[in-house]
Design a protein with these regions (language model features):
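Membrane-embedded transmembrane helical bundles of large multi-pass transporters/channels
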Residues: 1-35, 41, 134-377, 492-688
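Structured non-transmembrane domains adjacent to transmembrane bundles in polytopic membrane proteins
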Residues: 45-65, 70-159, 374, 380-542, ...
């Protein structure tokens, strides 16, 4: 370790040069990393609805679809518009009711339930399918091109809202970083003793962030959620590593003859402390990889990498920067304005039994509250209402009463009589307000011979045929999920290989998988962090007590939406607990490590807790404030509810964990001191 430390301090200029040069390939990697804006694509491939999507993509060459809404256009103008849409790159098929009826027949010739879904007043619908997937760049460019063909048209569907998501996410992501950096800078300016050090801290973390984002190229792609929150989370989580090294350097400067030797000692202490504590944080993020929804792998791996890069730059680049700019640091020194927190220590030492009583009463209550917090799964519900795709979807709902369209894939060779019977049964289900199939149209006098090949190819490829459905129920509701189950049962009674797919069924699978993921991720993160703490603290009881303390903070944070009567995005409900546990358990470890040191040295429990609080409260305060600052601004600024909620809850969680560790953790140490000393290694009998 000494050799490494000396290599860093003596080779500081080389390290700075290498780190800056590595920014070039990292920046190239960042620019070329594909971003996925379709959360549905993270569902497991073995889910039936994903198999349905796969059939659409491979067998029908329909990777995505959109609905074009025309207004006050004649039949001739609509057909001309269709021709223009067909010329757009990656568009596969285009069709409307006028391709079947032409100029001569009125829409009223169609079955009434179908007619009301394709024409309403002066508005008409055109169905467009794309060769590529919903979130593919080519599809998004095609949707954008179609929107620009005529000012009066609107484009609805998942591809349209995915484009909106991409555009708003890309327009805001730079502001997320700017806001996070600005707020962190304010906190650091106030809490550190030099006006220049904050710039070095942020510069060092900025390099680590670029490395992390650049290395995502090797993952193939990352989600827009990961892209939006990765930088601010990495900033908030790893900031205290750099602060720890800086404080150690300032201390050792008073104990050694020169600053190089002081930095050697600071790096050595930082490596021992930070590598140990960062392991719990990394483990917490990697617990997200247990999610069946592979978005968890996406976020977990990226954030675990971010922490690792943060540790690496803290023990290499940051010491080099501090040594090179030490004269400026000295010249810009000022008095820190961190408040005296000794009043917390005095309160806890005097009233720890009351604090613990609050904890014992609050733990089950907060658990109940968080278990009652509701999530929403409708991915468009969290988008701003002014977006063109959201507006178009609203037109479909309000004017055409198309709330949740989905479809059934059945054998193309199924007898037309059986298809009609099946469709009739489905029509009788509560909430179904439209079904459409070739067999149904044929029974109304519109034969296959009357249909253009493009229309027939959209719904029958010789191997599979598609039956379209429309439901009155909103996506991701219990009513729709129940309806889908009944539709599936009916369809499979006619064709055991039938598949019910589309946005509604996909969201139904999302609900089922998310509920499982929530349980798995939380239990895995707690288990992994617990095991690591067993080795770090060499104690059986302390990990239990500290995890309970942090879980209490998590329960409070997750229970607040229930108490406020609000719903949160389902992704937030899964990842918040793990992120908060992994990022803030270090607060509790920092305090308990000092407590163990004093107790194992022969000090009594009051002395140990008192010293531990003196040594850790200010560090916890600064670290939590930085974490809060890095995320709260994004939570307020973001117009995307998914990003806003995640960042708001993380920032709130940082403050709750800070208060929790400041009051609950030392109270637990005092009350369970005897248990701890008898279940931990390294204690002397005297004073135990």
């Amino acid at each position: 370790m000494k050799t490494f430390c000396k290599a860093v301090t003596r080779g500081r200029y080389v390290i700075i040069a290498i780190c800056l040069l590595l920014m070039i390939p990292a920046a190239i990697g960042y620019k070329n990393t594909k971003i996925n804006y379709d959360i549905v694509s993270y569902l497991p491939s073995d889910v039936e609805t994903m198999k349905g999507q796969d059939i659409l993509s491979k067998e029908f060459k329909q990777g995505a679809f959109a609905v074009v809404i025309t207004d006050n256009m004649s039949t001739k103008q609509i057909l001309n518009l269709e021709d223009r849409i067909k010329d757009v790159k990656t568009v596969n098929k285009v069709g409307s009711v006028y391709d079947i009826l032409g100029y001569s027949f009125p829409v009223q010739m169609l079955p009434s339930d179908i007619a009301s879904k394709v024409q309403k007043g002066d508005k008409n619908l055109i169905l467009v399918t794309f060769t590529n997937s919903t979130s593919d760049d080519a599809t998004l460019k095609a949707v954008e091109k179609i929107r620009g063909l005529k000012k009066s048209i609107q484009v609805a569907g998942m591809s349209a809202t995915t484009l909106d998501t991409a555009q708003i996410a890309n327009s805001e992501v730079i502001m997320y970083v700017i806001i996070a950096v600005a707020l962190c800078l304010i906190v650091l300016m106030l809490t550190l003793d030099s006006f220049f050090v904050p710039f070095l801290l942020l510069g060092n973390i900025g390099v680590a962030i670029v490395y992390n984002l650049g290395s995502n190229l090797f993952l193939g792609q990352i989600s827009y959620i990961t892209k939006a929150i990765a930088a601010v989370l990495q900033l908030g989580v790893t900031m205290d590593f750099s602060i720890f090294l800086y404080h150690k350097f300032e201390y050792w400067k008073t104990q050694r003859d020169n600053k190089l030797e002081a930095m050697d000692e600071a790096i050595a202490e930082t490596m021992i402390s930070v590598i140990g504590s960062s392991t719990t944080t990394i483990a917490g993020f990697l617990a997200l990889c247990t999610m069946k929804l592979t978005l968890g792998v996406d976020i977990g791996v990226v954030m675990a990498k971010g922490v690792a890069f943060g540790v690496l730059t803290v023990v290499t680049l940051f010491p080099a920067l501090v040594l090179v700019f030490d004269p400026i640091i000295t010249k810009t020194a000022h008095k820190s304005v961190v408040p005296d927190l000794s009043f917390i220590k005095r309160f806890v030492l005097k009233h720890y039994k009351i604090v613990l009583t609050v904890f014992v009463i609050g733990l089950p209550l907060s658990y109940y509250a968080q278990s009652r917090t509701q999530s929403y799964y409708n991915l468009t519900a969290g988008l701003p209402s002014y977006l063109p795709g959201v507006k178009a979807n609203d037109v479909l709902k309000k004017d055409f009463k198309i709330v949740s369209p989905y479809f059934i894939l059945v054998d193309s060779k199924m007898d037309a009589t059986d298809v009609k019977k099946m469709v009739d049964q489905i029509d009788d289900l509560k909430g179904i307000d439209m079904t459409a199939s070739i067999a149904k149209l044929s029974s109304q006098g519109i034969t296959e011979d009357m249909m253009p090949d493009d229309i027939k190819d959209m719904v029958d490829n010789g191997k599979y045929q598609i039956i379209l459905l429309s439901s009155k129920y909103d996506t991701a509701t219990d009513q729709l999920n129940s309806q889908i189950a009944h539709v599936s049962k009916i369809a499979k009674s006619y064709d055991k290989h039938a598949i019910v797919a589309g946005e509604g069924p996909l969201m139904r699978d999302m609900v089922t998988i998310a509920d499982t993921d929530f349980t798995n991720v939380n239990s895995t993160s707690i288990g992994v962090v617990f095991v690591i703490m067993l080795f770090v603290l060499k104690s059986i009881s302390l990990p239990v007590l500290l995890v309970l303390a942090i879980e209490f903070a998590i329960f409070i944070n997750m229970g607040i939406p229930f108490m406020m009567g609000t719903k949160i995005p389902f992704v937030a409900s899964i990842v918040i607990g793990t992120i908060q546990l992994g990022a803030t358990i270090d607060y509790a470890i920092l305090m308990s490590t000092k407590y163990l040191e004093i107790r194992q040295g022969g000090g009594d429990k009051v002395q140990a807790v008192s010293t531990a609080m003196d040594a850790s409260l200010q560090s916890i305060f600064v670290s939590a404030l930085c974490f809060f600052a890095a995320t709260v601004g994004v939570g307020i600024y973001s117009s995307m509810d998914m990003i806003s909620t995640i960042c708001s809850m993380i920032s709130r969680g940082a403050l709750i964990s800070m208060i929790d560790v400041a009051f609950i953790a030392p109270s637990l140490l005092l009350v369970f001191d005897k248990v701890i000393t008898h279940t931990s290694l390294g204690f002397k009998k005297k004073g135990a």
